């Protein structure tokens, strides 16, 4: 499969964004409760796709796997940009 020169559009609907936000918050808390560095663990999962970065504790692993990693990245970028004054 080759790459195209045309720009491809990617969009999430608002319901997906809210679900991803809830999931990330829940997973963060579960990681924190288990004594992990939540940021490092979530980054490890998002970059590698390896669910072993997220514990089964509080069903965190199953929760985060319900979302595609690219959708998680989109929500993280959107949240960061909004927090830095960018109107989206």
Curated annotation (Swiss-Prot):
Per the record, the similarity remark reads:
Belongs to the UPF0297 family.
Q: Which source organism?
A: Streptococcus suis (strain 05ZYH33)
NCBIfam families according to UniProt: PRK05473.1
The highest taxon in the source lineage is Bacteria
Pfam families with a match to the protein in the record: IreB
- Name of the featured protein: UPF0297 protein SSU05_0066
Check the record and name the InterPro entries matching this protein.
Answer: IreB
Disulfide bond sites: none
